[in-house]
Amino acid sequence: MLFLVRHGETEWNLHKRLQGQQDIPLSEVGVNQARELGLHFQNQHIVFEHVYTSDLLRAHQTAQLITKGMSISKFTIEPNLRERFYGELEGEYIDDIVKLMPDYDKNFGVKMQYGIESLEDMQKRMVSILTSIAKVTEGSPTLIVSHGGSINALLHYITKGEMGTGKGKLANTSFTRLQWSNQTFHVQAYNETSRLKVT
């Protein structure tokens, strides 16, 4: 069972600045969100046997806070779980970017400018790394902390466009639960936030 978690809130999330692969830490709210999610998993008696996280600070911090108090012997830091690279636009305000490129984050097949990683390339690396993780972990409870754009690109692939990119945003510290069987991913929970008290 794969629990795919978007990192906790950062100040750039709050101020609607495009983070991409900039190494931004969690805000105080983000820290509390991650702790709360960890307590939720413990209350549900979910014990992770494997933990994978993007190498970006906000994801790594989230993974550490979620698993505090759990007996986790090893974290696997995986750069392919990173957020999409937004090139020259990283750090800009999202409202300004939408005026410049309305489809920058919604549609596949759009020619990218400003050095932005294409949605197709991001999706390929996410599908590849998640498939590898699924094969290695063989159904055991696995925590994977990544980023909203990356997770959505994966979900777009899995659901043939019914979920994911262009269909909505993932909340900070929401989790999406995937089952891997017969060489295929199956979505069992999506953008789950019902236990969130910290916003």
Task: Describe the residue ranges of each PLM region.
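Active-site-proximal alpha-helix that buttresses catalytic centers in soluble enzyme cores
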Residues: 5, 9-70
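Phosphate-handling substructures
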Residues: 67-127, 188-190
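Extreme N-terminal starter segment of soluble prokaryotic enzymes
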Residues: 1-3
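Glycine-rich phosphate-binding loop signature in dinucleotide/nucleotide-binding domains
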Residues: 44-47, 133-141
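Short active-site segment of divalent metal-dependent hydrolases/proteases
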Residues: 10, 150-151
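Short basic (Lys/Arg) and small-residue
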Residues: 147
